[in-house]
Swiss-Prot record:
Every FBD domain range: 364-412
The protein's name: Putative F-box/FBD/LRR-repeat protein At3g49480
Keywords, comma-separated and alphabetical: Leucine-rich repeat, Repeat
Pfam families: F-box, FBD, LRR_At5g56370
């Protein structure tokens, strides 16, 4: 009896797919793995070279084999895509200082048949992220980088020296992120920003442990819609405490996020279109507070540093949502002072980290008149970090009882609350006279509208 032997033949159904579909498949794997497909067959040899996104991210295995730097250099020589949607280079502290990844990028060429087309950074990158954490000195970007016509999003991080030539033009750049970079001099960032006529979003992070050669960071960008600025104590031995560290002239700004431990060094010019402000200034100035009068969304942290300057604003006439971080009990009365200036407030969020022990309760005087926002507009009230002290309970009770249009209320206990103490929260629910129920552990602490 003849035995029937079956032979299974693996059929390659992928290679017959069109190039566009193969490129989409390779985009689902790391760039290094995509490039390795060049050894599969002649059909695959050139497919990866058309990838519109390249990611070079150093890993532990790359460091041991020294492959990431070789791969970075070689792949730029062969890449042929007409346009790079994103180029991401992320090299860690193990990157040898005798290599220069910037030169590799500078030498990369666009893909005409002659292979001598214009530099990659001149013509065909939309989104560039370059992060360098090596142990060497900060390195300069190539001059061609400052003339890239297609660049729309840019992130420079850590050991990058921003040395801007006299003439510079980034006509398409809309988003810029400068993370702990070093600037050649005081004017380098000014020249860079002035070359971006359509810049919409600027994010700046300054490292307190690194001298970045800038005393006053100036942001003068008429087109800017959002500014994120983060910095710590950056005083130098020759620093004048009265000198501003941030000066902004952004008349069309809509959103301002500032995290700065030297808030009194801010100079914010007139911003009539400002909608959202998030800040954790330690020492805000009156000049900083005044432009906030037109905002719709406001987050103040810590609130105790803002109280002395609240008088600078008579009325937050457009404010719809307010989130504050509370750290002192004697500021409870100031909450109602703030509410009295927010006639259209719909959402009021309090994030409290006040300790419940070793404290003499402050005398809280109920205001003679109910803030207009409570009687007419407030819809959402949340208190996160409730500890059940008597003065805290009184002000929460006052807000709940006088908020005639309240739809939802959330109160979350402090993490140190015991089971017995949590029973006290039930008292708050019984105090509430409106149909709204108090959600005892659902404070979300986020803007709603």
């Amino acid at each position: 009896m003849t035995e029937l032997v079956e032979h299974r033949v693996c059929e390659d159904r992928i290679s017959s797919l069109p190039d566009d579909l193969l490129v989409k498949i390779l985009l689902c794997v790391p760039t290094k793995d995509a490039a390795a497909t060049t050894f599969l067959s002649k059909r695959w040899r050139f497919v990866w070279r058309m990838l519109p996104r390249l990611n070079y991210i150093e890993t532990t295995s790359d460091v041991k084999s020294n492959t990431v730097w070789w791969f970075l250099e070689e792949s730029f020589r062969f890449h042929k895509a007409p346009l790079l949607e994103r180029l991401w280079i992320d090299l860690g502290p193990q990157c040898p200082i005798n290599v220069n990844p910037v030169k590799w990028v500078a030498k990369a060429r666009a893909p005409p048949a002659s292979n001598v087309g214009p530099p990659l950074l001149d013509t065909r990158v939309r989104w560039l992220t370059f992060r360098l954490l090596w142990k060497g000195e900060p390195i300069r970007m190539p001059k061609s980088f400052y003339f890239c016509k297609t660049l729309e999003r840019l992130t420079l991080s850590d050991k990058i020296l921003v040395d801007v030539p006299c003439q510079v033009s980034l006509p398409s750049l809309r988003e810029l992120d400068l993370f702990c970079v070093v600037y050649k001099d005081e004017d380098s960032h000014v020249k860079l920003l002035s070359s971006c006529p359509v810049l919409k979003h600027l994010k700046v992070t300054r490292n307190r442990r690194v001298e970045d050669n800038v005393r006053t960071f100036r942001v003068e960008v008429p087109s800017l819609l959002r500014l994120d600025y983060k910095a710590g104590m950056m005083f130098r031995e020759d620093s004048d405490m009265s000198d501003p560290f941030l000066v902004t002239d952004t008349p069309n700004l809509l959103s301002l996020h500032i995290f700065d431990t030297v808030g009194y060094s801010l100079s914010v010019w007139y911003m009539p279109h400002l909608v959202t402000v998030v800040t954790d200034e330690l020492f805000p100035s009156e000049k900083f507070m005044r432009p906030l009068s037109s905002v719709k969304y406001l987050a103040l942290s810590p609130f105790d540093t803002m109280v002395p300057w609240c008088d600078a604003v008579n009325n937050y006439s457009r404010l719809v949502e307010c989130m504050i971080h509370l750290s002192e009990y004697d500021l409870l009365e100031s909450l109602l002072v703030l509410l009295s200036k927010c006639s259209k407030l719909k959402v009021f969020l309090v994030d409290s980290d006040i300790p419940r022990w070793n404290h003499d309760p402050a005398l809280w005087n109920q205001p003679s008149s109910i803030p207009r926002c409570l009687s007419s507009h407030l819809e959402i009230f949340e208190w996160d970090g409730y500890v059940g002290r008597e003065d805290e309970k009184k002000i929460i009770r006052y807000i709940l009882e006088n908020s005639k249009y309240l739809k939802t209320a959330g109160i979350s206990p402090n993490s140190t609350f015991s089971g017995e103490e949590k029973q006290k929260m039930e008292e708050l629910e019984s105090m509430h006279r409106t149909p709204t129920s108090v959600l005892l552990s659902s404070a979300r602490m986020s803007f709603r509208y």
